[in-house]
A protein has these predicted regions:
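Non-ligating segments of multi-cofactor redox enzymes
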Residues: 1-578
């Protein structure tokens, strides 16, 4: 047994109201920059729907995740090393910008500077990629709230699997919201797909990150990720992904999406797992056994043997104590109401979901029945095939059994706690019917309904033991004296050049530990004519560092040459000379 720790998240889908607050705050914190306008580390999808990017769940098309070969061994669905080598310069299986959407802005100057006229001026949408006028045809949440109608809904890859069994009646359909971030998998296909080894999983907390120094822009990770949560920055030529807000996590704060969530539906905590069982769990033959296999990988933090093994593995004591109080462990293994998203991808995802009971309750109340009665709820779960079957395709590789069990437990809690809150004698047979005790029902109700901040987010702080003293001192100095957003091309900063700019100052570690741009061009100063020995990456040069092989413009003096032909001179915005 090799014990490791993993920070994981559980989302209660019944509490998501689709307000997109998490998406907006994540966007402002992480991807409010040039080159990642189309990137949403966190997005909220309406189900049924196509998702973002469009039809990303269709792995027959996108070739994401893992599969078993003829010998029963785990292999990437997109192919092994030889296939990747043959297609390394032209990845044939990758979403285009049209599968995401072409980002745009508006020509607001048309409104602010328009003279008096008879007709109302119009601010036309302009592409952020080309700068030309464009027609808006899609976005990250174009089909929000089933806005596209049955024309768009019928393209849902999950719904297509059910087309032979169920015909979607749009007027009587159900819907729910599905917030998505990077799954930070135990067996990440994106890391295995990267030819440069730029994607890595941190040993101390399991967060999957991208080393910007090692990334060469092959984009195999985009194909390898079945959830399509790795994005390509077209200006820097690097891959970017959700970081699980690790600068906040390291000081015991939740992710920005969890912090700002209006519905308080997210739970974050530590899970201990046996690293030696990961490959075995991901390699089970039947897709429907993957849920059980992944749950078996997780270790009971109250087990003395697990505690001793964790201590021998160097896991701090406070992390073990946090695992004992973890809401994630309770929802996944104690109450067994949380399920992984698409376990059939075999990545062993670590962002789990509590399926929504609301479609069942709504169907009962719409027909005049008591939506809180245990008997009515149990019967509706068995008879309403559409919600259960659809949820099974999302969370249990098509097996409706675990979904029924989860919905039954949620229904039992709903009915039992109604009697308690109304002062009536609770029916003790309700918990027994779903294999739970009265204490389990009450504890689950507290966690799902009235848990406070410190109960929903049990996050131990990072430990500085073993760090290089000089590095630790610098990080403390940075924390006290620097702004975490004060770096070139950071959120809110103005970009300074074309593809490959922002090679100057290093990004503070308080914001990213990608070692981003550490020695991208071996210099962080403007051109110094007296220094002729500095190396420079000519493919990514932006006028900072030594000029290399580029000669200064004929009409520019040496001390004012900023970047060679076509590049802006120092101190002149956008390269416009007077």
């Amino acid at each position: 047994m090799r014990v490791m720790s993993q920070l994981a998240m559980v989302m209660n889908l019944d509490k998501c109201i689709g307000c997109h607050t998490c998406s907006v705050t994540c966007k402002q914190a992480w991807t409010n920059r040039s080159g990642v306008e189309y990137v949403w580390f966190n997005n909220v999808e309406t189900r049924p729907g196509q998702g973002y990017p469009r039809t990303y769940q269709d792995q027959e098309r996108w070739q994401g995740g893992w599969t078993l070969n003829r010998r029963g061994r785990l292999t990437l669905k997109a192919g092994g090393r030889l296939k990747k080598l043959l297609s390394i310069f032209s990845n044939p299986v990758m979403p285009s910008i049209y599968d995401y959407y072409e980002p745009w802005t508006y020509d607001y100057e048309t409104l602010t500077n328009a003279p008096a006229q008879q007709h109302t001026p119009v601010a036309r949408p302009k592409s952020l990629l080309t700068g030309r006028d464009m027609k808006v045809t899609w976005s990250a949440n174009w089909d929000d709230d089933l806005g596209g109608g049955p024309t768009l809904t019928q393209d849902d890859p999950v719904l297509k699997k059910l087309s032979e069994k169920i015909t979607l009646d749009f007027e009587q359909t159900f819907m729910f919201y599905l917030p998505r971030i990077c799954e930070h998998c135990l067996n990440p296909a994106c890391a295995a797909s990267c030819p440069s080894g730029a994607i890595y999983k941190r040993a101390e907390d399991g967060i999957v990150l991208v080393d910007q120094d090692r990334c060469r822009g092959w984009r195999m990770c985009v194909t390898g990720c079945p959830y399509k949560k790795v994005y390509f920055n077209h200006r820097t030529g690097k891959a970017e992904k959700c970081t699980f807000c690790f600068p906040r996590i390291e000081v015991g704060l939740p992710t920005i999406c969890a912090e700002t969530c209006v519905g308080r539906l997210r739970y974050i905590g530590v899970v201990l797992y046996d690293a030696d069982k990961v490959l075995e769990a991901a390699s089970v033959t039947d897709d429907k056994d993957l849920l059980r296999a992944q749950r078996a990988v997780f270790l009971d933090p109250d087990d003395p043997a697990v505690q001793r093994a964790a201590e021998e593995a160097g896991i701090p004591r406070d992390w073990v104590e946090s695992a004992q109080r973890s809401p994630v462990w309770a929802l996944i293994n104690r109450f067994e109401v949380a399920l992984p998203l698409h376990p059939e991808y075999r990545t062993l995802p670590m962002v789990w979901y509590i399926p929504p009971l609301s479609p069942v309750v709504d169907s009962l109340t719409d027909t005049g029945h008591d939506g809180e009665n245990a008997g009515n709820l149990f019967g509706a779960i068995d008879t309403l095939r559409i919600p259960v079957t659809y949820l099974a395709e999302l969370f249990t590789a098509g097996d409706p059994g675990p979904v029924r069990d989860v919905l039954a437990r949620l229904a039992a809690m709903r009915s039992f706690m109604r009697d308690v809150n109304l002062g009536r004698e609770p029916d003790v047979s309700i918990p027994d019917a779903v294999g739970m005790t009265t204490d389990d029902i009450e504890d689950m109700h507290r966690l799902l309904a009235i848990a406070k901040y410190d109960e929903r987010y049990v996050i131990p702080t990072a430990h500085a033991e073993g760090r290089d003293p000089q590095q630790l001192a610098h990080s403390l100095e940075e924390l006290a004296t620097e702004c975490s957003l004060d770096y070139e091309d950071g959120p809110g900063m103005t970009p300074s050049g074309p593809f490959g700019e922002s090679s100057g100052g290093a990004v503070p570690i308080a914001l990213e530990n990608f070692q981003m741009l550490k020695q991208r061009q071996r210099s962080d100063t403007f051109v110094d004519p007296s220094d002729g020995r500095e190396r420079v990456n000519l493919l990514n040069w932006d006028g900072k560092g030594q000029g290399g092989l580029f000669l200064p413009a004929p009409d520019a003096p040496d001390d004012d040459a900023g970047g060679g032909p076509g590049m802006p001179a120092r101190g002149e915005p956008d390269g416009i000379r007077p």
